[in-house]
Amino acid sequence: MTYNEFAMDVLELIEECPKDWRSGQSIFNIVDSKYGIARDVQFIDGIDCFYDDNQIDAFLNSAYKRLKNE
């Protein structure tokens, strides 16, 4: 899977999340439920898009790197 495929896979699922969630919250929860690596990105890599939407790109990049290294 390429980075673009991964990102599109995550971004397409945002519409299924509750409407009152911010984008970062949605992305975090999608990555956590589908791939199980969101908390590693948040706590080990120190990139937290759940509380800071400005970190979405960095979060997705770090999550993708973790998937590629599995």
Where on the chain are the PLM-derived regions?
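C-terminal alpha-helical interaction appendages
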Residues: M1-E70
